[in-house]
Amino acid sequence: MKYSTLAWLVIASYTVFAQDGTSVTGYTTTIVIPGSPPAGAGTAHGDTENTGTVHTTEHLTGTEETHTTGATPETTTIVAPTTTHENTTTHETSVENTATVHHNTTTLHHNTTTIHPNATGTETHTETGTGTLTGTGTEGPALTTTTVAEAFSLAAGASLGYLVALLFL
């Protein structure tokens, strides 16, 4: 059981490492600042600033040697939002008076009431009939003490078999 768990962990870790095999050498950052940018802060308009240091040494032999140190340069882009203000006002006034006359019509319906008298009465229903019930068949055996004894013996045998099986496990 422990071996199979270890095998699954190894397979899962190889799967994760296979998906994560990317390398990064440089990166670009875009910063969006609301409003106008302050004067003289950082680089503007996507210019690139190299933070490395360059040393130039000239030997007595006349050859020139150049050493460059520093990290991979970072490119920073600052995007300032542009705001446009436009005010447009249009006033149009139009007044038209329209009169509509509606005629009221009233319809009167006559009320009609119908009175039904309550009816009371008694009803008697009698059903009589004659017939014959016929059929053939056999009646099953009744539960006897022999059947109960066989069931008890079967249960005891199953219990004994269960106990013997537990001894060998």
Swiss-Prot record:
One of its GO terms (biological process) is cell adhesion. Keywords: Cell adhesion, Cell membrane, Glycoprotein, GPI-anchor, Lipoprotein, Membrane, Signal, Virulence. GO terms for cellular component: plasma membrane; side of membrane. It comes from the Eukaryota. Induction: Up-regulated upon milbemycins A3 oxim derivative (A3Ox) treatment. It is found in: Cell membrane. Residues 1-18 form the signal peptide. A lipid is attached at G140 (GPI-anchor amidated glycine). Its main location: membrane. It is a lipid-anchor; GPI-anchor. Glycans are attached at N87, N104, N111, N118. The keyword Membrane applies. Residues 141-169 form a propeptide. Putative adhesin which may be involved in cell adhesion and virulence. This is Probable GPI-anchored adhesin-like protein PGA22. It comes from Candida albicans (strain SC5314 / ATCC MYA-2876). The lineage of its organism: Eukaryota, Fungi, Dikarya, Ascomycota, Saccharomycotina. The gene is PGA22.
